[in-house]
């Protein structure tokens, strides 16, 4: 079930979306095309949640998301960029389902407690592939088969581990320790389920309204800024460093939003409001332990 579905077919131009992500390959439902489209999107469209801290209510209909990401060259969160990718894949001929996931908070080492993430399941030639271009921290760029076998990519291992009633997306770096990304059910959801997520996060009392979060692939590394913490995932090693002042924030944002200068300006505006004195409004950040046990 497509969160961007409506009573009529999408009218936005597929050519423009594919130009936005720089994809020039064949438009046919093959694994090779799926991999190339996912790679092109992940490397071209930044992840960002700038709407919530600015009090902007995003529209999730197809035309609005397309306008934000393509003509206006914006980024987006899972409800936007994963939904846009799902719609594009369907128009090319892929069978795509959208399911709800519960994200793992890497800085706090716990799940959010909410089904607050959209994940795509692409059914192709008898295999189900997990696709996700809308997650802040490191996830696989390429589709991962839903078969529990480890999948190697850019110095990391990924797998989809089944439990009693959930599937846990996990990754392992050079230390060999499997850590969760999110968990989900193979249970396609209607559009209304995703509208509920949006409404929750836009309430002023939620942490998203006071959180600056953006991410991008850069020179083979995944850079994720979460308020005043920069999480860098590079060839199997993840590190967390503080971003202590506006100059450092500007440098990080310039790298994450390269070729998207308007997003740098907007993100710095959010930074100044959240950190007028370079103070962390949500308290100290727990260290990420290299000996963290695998979540059960």
Residue ranges and their predicted role:
Residues 229-296:
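Extended, charged low-complexity segments
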Residues 1-12, 263, 291, 295-296:
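Linear, non-domain "peripheral" regions
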Residues 5-73:
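Secondary-structure boundary elements
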Residues 73-100, 120, 214:
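Cysteine-centered nucleophilic/redox motifs
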Residues 2-21, 25, 40-46, 103-248:
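His-Asp-centered catalytic microenvironments across diverse enzyme cores
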Residues 17, 88, 252-253:
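Residues within well-ordered alpha helices
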Residues 20, 91, 255-256:
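Residues at alpha-helix termini
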